[in-house]
Amino acid sequence: MPSSWGKIFKVGTFGESHGKSVGVIVEGVPAGIPIRLEEIQKDLDRRRPGQSNLTTPRDENDTVRVVSGVFEGKTIGSPIALVVENQNTNSKDYENLRTTYRPSHADYTYQMKYGFRAHVGGGRSSVRETIGRVAAAAIARMILKDDLGIETVAWVDSIGTIQSTIGEKYPKSREEVDQNEVRCPDAVSADQMRSLILKMKEAGDSVGGTIKCVSYNLPPGLGDPVYDKLDGDLAKAILSIPACKGFEVGSGFSGTLLTGSSHNDEFYVEGGTGKVRTKTNNSGGLQGGISNGEELVIRAAFKPTSTIFKKQNTINLKGEETTLEAKGRHDPCVLPRAVPIIEAVVNLVLVDAYLYQRAINPQWFQKWARIPDYYKDLEL
């Protein structure tokens, strides 16, 4: 079962929903980087369950522990192991899933592929796998911010038929997004979304939606042509998130409604800075699979949570038709907790692209990167 990703900044996650622990091994992190444990914990706190009555009531502290790769608060170049203990499992609620498949869940496909599965909590298909990715991405975020000034901010753009009305007035910080529990910067829409989620929760049902994400201060040159396009890497990473079913960059599918003359992003030279800019950003910051220096703009679609508390038709292990009323603790809508997960996988893709570009083109690094003091402190 593949569980690793990355060319330079390599991430390998481990653990299941109801196992003893979940975590991640991170390779390729340069030595000498200060690891701010409180920043990693802050990111994990944003994705943890039990944050509000909009999320699953499973109450986990998700306290991270650094097992290796860090000495006196700094990376030493060896693999970094980050571990979070599972403390609030309730496996008896899943006993009926030992022999019965949840519709639209990974239960059936895992059974068909492997012939055996961990039925409690969804096992490896659980969103708790993303704890490792969020923890690793906190390190990635530190590197991107310190070296390039890159900031990635995601938010809930829609839930059900309720659409945020902020347009291209994108939030500049995660603090703006976190002002409400829905994580939608449009306060009016957020209230409507909250009511819809609670309505679905009361009905034992679920609802999906979309998340938008912007990365600021990307330099031109990240990503590679053809098979290693940055948008291709982003698509694979984002679609690997549980419940994510759609992805677009820039104008995305709506761009098909435009003509070339209205869709093309015309270049100009910015007065005062001399920077090459584009008048519009329908490309979403990517052209030919490579960043062009504009904001990276993506959107991801999440289906309604598959585990619901309504009676549904399904089959059992014997292939017999039956019905299922699910138990356990589940999110009526994954969107509020998926926001930090989207930010995480975007940062993982970007840091891998950055470290690769830095390795193959030192002149690019000298031109675009800021050299933090901790690199200068290395005794070589």
Swiss-Prot record:
Name one molecular function that GO assigns to this entry.
FMN binding
Give the enzyme's EC designation: 4.2.3.5
The protein's UniProt keywords, in alphabetical order, are: Amino-acid biosynthesis, Aromatic amino acid biosynthesis, FAD, Flavoprotein, FMN, Lyase, NADP
**Annotated residues for binding of FMN:** 124-126, 288, 303-307, 329
Q: Does the keyword Lyase apply?
A: yes
Top-rank taxon = Bacteria
**Cellular component terms, GO, for this chain's entry?**
cytosol
Which cofactor(s) does the record list?
A: FMNH2
Q: What class of enzyme is it?
A: lyase
Pathway noted in the entry: Metabolic intermediate biosynthesis; chorismate biosynthesis; chorismate from D-erythrose 4-phosphate and phosphoenolpyruvate: step 7/7
A biological process (GO) annotation for this entry?
chorismate biosynthetic process
Please tell me where NADP(+) binds in this chain.
Answer: 47
According to the record, how does the cofactor bind?
A: Reduced FMN (FMNH(2)).
Q: Subunit comment for this entry? A: Homotetramer.
**HAMAP family in the record, alphabetically?**
Chorismate_synth (MF_00300)
Described by its record, this protein's role is as follows: This reaction introduces a second double bond into the aromatic ring system.
Family named by the database record: Belongs to the chorismate synthase family.
What is the protein named?
Answer: Chorismate synthase
Annotated source species? Leptospira borgpetersenii serovar Hardjo-bovis (strain JB197)
- Which classification does the entry list for the species? Bacteria, Pseudomonadati, Spirochaetota, Spirochaetia, Leptospirales
Name the gene: aroC
